[in-house]
Amino acid sequence: MGSSEMEKSGKEKEPKTTPPSTSSSAPATVVSQEPSSAVSAGVAVTQDWSGFQAYSPMPPHGYVASSPQPHPYMWGVQHMMPPYGTPPHPYVTMYPPGGMYAHPSLPPGSYPYSPYAMPSPNGMAEASGNTGSVIEGDGKPSDGKEKLPIKRSKGSLGSLNMIIGKNNEAGKNSGASANGACSKSAESGSDGSSDGSDANSQNDSGSRHNGKDGETASESGGSAHGPPRNGSNLPVNQTVAIMPVSATGVPGPPTNLNIGMDYWSGHGNVSGAVPGVVVDGSQSQPWLQVSDEREIKRQRRKQSNRESARRSRLRKQAECDELAQRAEVLNGENSSLRAEINKLKSQYEELLAENSSLKNKFSSAPSLEGGDLDKNEQEPQRSTRQDVA
C-alpha cells in the first residue's frame, strides 16, 4: 500500500517531457500554449464561483453611500498561512477572476524580456530567449529543457547587445546568436535550415561579403525559412542610445588650467595655448572673443568701482567742509555769548554795590524818620478836635 502510493507520487512528480520538435515553428507554438493553459487552469478553479458566495448580495449602488472600503471579509483577522487541511478563505469565491482588483489588460509578450512569445509585424509568434534550439547543421536535435536557463540568460544578453548596438561592429564575427544558439549558416549548404537570430547572420554576411556567392545564398535561404529577427521586431518604446561623436579632424578647445586665475591677472593678459596642440584660427577665434568680452566686463566693473569710490570720497569731503563751517559759526556764537555773560556779570556786581550802599544809608537815619511820623500823627488829631468843637 505504501509502496504503491510512493510510486504514484513519484510518477506525479516526474515532469512531462515533450518530444523534440523538428521544425523551426515548434518553440513558438509551445510558448504560445503556456498562457492559454494557465488561463484555462484559473477558469477551472473558479468556474462555479457564483454558487459559493458566503455573504448576502450587496444592495444597489443607489441606496448606499459611496465608500472606498472593500467587502467586510477584509476587516477580520486572516491567517498568514492557514492550518493544514482547512479549506481556503471564502473571499476566493467572492468575486469572479479579475473582478475586484483587475490586472491591467496587457497582452502577453507586449514588453521585452518576457517569457511569452512576442508578436512580430509579419504575424509570426517570436519567443524572447526561452525556446530551445532547432536542428543544427549535422541533423542532431538539441535538448531544449537542459539548455533553457543558459539560453535565457544568453538571450537577455543578446537582446541587450542588440539595444546598445555592441554587436553591429564590422569585422567581429560573434559565434553566439541572440537566443544563445550557435549560428551555422556558413556551414549549412542549400538546406535552408538556420538557427539563431538574423541580426548576427546579417553581421556575418556584412563582414564576410567578399564575393562568396555560396555563403550569401545559404544565408538568404536560412533567413527565408527562419523567422526574421531584425531591428523591426523590437518594441516601439525601446530607444537606442546615441552618443555624440565629434567629427574627426576638427580639434576642440584647448584645456586651460588657469581659467580661475584670469580674474587676478594684469590688464590685457590672455592665457596662451597649450604647447603641443595645434589650434585652428577659426576654432580659437570664439574663445578669444569670449576672453575679450570677459576682460571688457572686468574693466567696466573696475571702472564702476573706481567711480563709486570717487563719488563717496567727494561726498565725504563736502560733508567735512560743511561741518567745519558750522564749527566756525558755532565758535563765533560761543565767543559772543561769553562776552555777553561777562557784561552781565559786571552789571550784577554794580547792582550789588548799589544795593549795599542803600542799605547802609537806611540803617544810619532811623530817628529822623521816627520824629516825622510823630508830627504827622499829632496834626490829624488836632484837626479832628477843631471839627468837633
From Swiss-Prot:
On the tree of life, the source organism's domain of life is Eukaryota
Residue ranges of region Disordered? 1-42, 124-154, 170-236, 285-318, 356-389
InterPro entries, alphabetized = bZIP (IPR004827), bZIP_plant_GBF1 (IPR045314), bZIP_sf (IPR046347), GBF-like (IPR044827), MFMR (IPR012900)
Biased composition (Polar residues) is annotated at 356-366
One term of GO molecular function: transcription cis-regulatory region binding
Return the GO cellular component terms, semicolon-separated: nucleus
Reply yes or no: does the keyword Transcription apply.
Answer: yes
Which part of the chain holds the cross-link Glycyl lysine isopeptide (Lys-Gly) (interchain with G-Cter in ubiquitin)? Answer: K154
The protein's location, in the record's own words, is: Nucleus
Q: What does this protein do?
A: Transcriptional activator that binds to the G-box motif (5'-CACGTG-3') and other cis-acting elements with 5'-ACGT-3' core, such as Hex, C-box and as-1 motifs. Possesses high binding affinity to G-box, much lower affinity to Hex and C-box, and little affinity to as-1 element. G-box and G-box-like motifs are cis-acting elements defined in promoters of certain plant genes which are regulated by such diverse stimuli as light-induction or hormone control. Binds to the G-box motif 5'-CACGTG-3' of LHCB2.4 (At3g27690) promoter.
Q: Which family does it belong to?
A: Belongs to the bZIP family.
Assembly with partners or alone? Monomer, homodimer and heterodimers with GBF1/BZIP41, GBF2/BZIP54 and GBF3/BZIP55. Heterodimers with BZIP16. Interacts with GIP1.
Put simply, this protein is called bZIP transcription factor 68
Species of provenance: Arabidopsis thaliana
Instruction: Give the organism's phylogenetic lineage.
Output: Eukaryota, Viridiplantae, Streptophyta, Embryophyta, Tracheophyta
Q: Which gene encodes it?
A: BZIP68
